[in-house]
Swiss-Prot record:
Main function: Binds to the 23S rRNA.
This protein's record includes keyword Ribosomal protein: yes
Record-linked Gene3D superfamilies: Ribosomal protein L9, C-terminal domain, Ribosomal protein L9, N-terminal domain
Cellular component GO terms, alphabetical: ribonucleoprotein complex; ribosome
The protein, known as: Large ribosomal subunit protein bL9
Gene this protein is translated from: rplI
Amino acid sequence: MAQLLLIKDVEALGRSGEIVNVKPGFARNFLLPQSLAVIADKNTLRMQERLKAEREKRAIADKKESEAVAMQIEGMTLVQVVKVDQEGHMYGSVTVAEIVHLIQDHAKIELEKKDIQLKHPIKTTGVHSLVVKLKEGVTANFNLKVMSEEGYRTSLEEQKA
């Protein structure tokens, strides 16, 4: 096992400033070339204190920012119009990338695809409850209403009446 000091947060491994034990191949082929970690020795212990202090400051700022974004997203309902065949089955599916674009267009919030928790692409019409996982463990729930073009036109006509 190789002992490394993480310079940046690594998903499912640790936060910056932590010393972790990883297999040599993972260190040699991924963490070290991408500058995500350095080999832990006496000199890096001083770096560890500085990294921990920076991480704590960044964590506080990230949590505030994430909570503000979560308040905007929480309870929001977005509408995605899709094409369907005569039996009501969708052509294709609604993907995470499309959901991210919907949120950007509707709420002017920049998210990454990894923030949306979706196990499988959405392949049915109706209302789907989704979760956004933001930094520092902050989550927000919102609804995605997938409608056929015909159903969307009908709902617009009902709103006008």
